[in-house]
Each structure stands twice: as structure tokens, then as C-alpha cells.
Amino acid sequence: MSKSTIKFVRLSPTKTRLIAKEIQGMNAEFALATLEFTPNRGAKYIANAILSAVANGGFEPNEVIVKSCRVDAGPVLKRFRPRARGTASRIRKPTSHIMVEVSKPSKEA
């Protein structure tokens, strides 16, 4: 089993979790092919995390499965935008931490 972590990615964790749930349990090679054609910004970062986890373990993408893919919330950058009558509204810019674990499939008889 090998792990990979990408921290402080400027993505919403809520939106990125949708992709992470889809690829959990998939073969790593199939997951990478799926992510390549997923029209979401988070797919690129998750694909990089999978490639990194595969390389960390010294595996090939076709011989491992994505055991777990977790997206946690990081710190939120807070910015302000001027509004009418001298007021200001807060803009939240969320960040994410992406954790991926890959391992060889277990031999089930």
C-alpha cells in the first residue's frame, strides 16, 4: 500500500468529493482514464495524486486499485468585496487536502 497527499489545493472540497467517491475501488489505470475525460477542475489534481501514489509504491497503474480517496477541507481564504452604501461582503475561497491510497488487490478465493 502506498499513499500520496496534495495539500492546499484551491478547490472546493464539496465539489472535489463528488469525483473522489466515483473512483474509489477502481483499478488505477481505469480511474486515470476516467478522470482524463471528467469535465471538472478537481479531476486533474486527483489524477496527479493517483500517479504520485503509484510511483511512491513502485507499482504500475494496471496492477493496483484505488483503495481510498479522501478530500478534506483545508483553510479558507477570506476576501472582501466592496458593496453598496459603504458596506463589504465576505468572499470565501476554500482549499482542499487530497489523500489517495493505492494497493494491490487482495486475493479472494
Curated annotation (Swiss-Prot):
Residues 84-109 are annotated as: Disordered. GO terms for molecular function: rRNA binding; structural constituent of ribosome. Transmembrane segments: none annotated. One of its GO terms (cellular component) is cytosolic large ribosomal subunit. It comes from the Bacteria. GO terms for biological process: translation. Pfam families: Ribosomal_L22. Disulfide bonds: none annotated. Keywords: Ribonucleoprotein, Ribosomal protein, RNA-binding, rRNA-binding. The keyword Ribonucleoprotein applies. This protein binds specifically to 23S rRNA; its binding is stimulated by other ribosomal proteins, e.g. L4, L17, and L20. It is important during the early stages of 50S assembly. It makes multiple contacts with different domains of the 23S rRNA in the assembled 50S subunit and ribosome. The globular domain of the protein is located near the polypeptide exit tunnel on the outside of the subunit, while an extended beta-hairpin is found that lines the wall of the exit tunnel in the center of the 70S ribosome. HAMAP family: Ribosomal_uL22_B. Belongs to the universal ribosomal protein uL22 family. This is Large ribosomal subunit protein uL22.
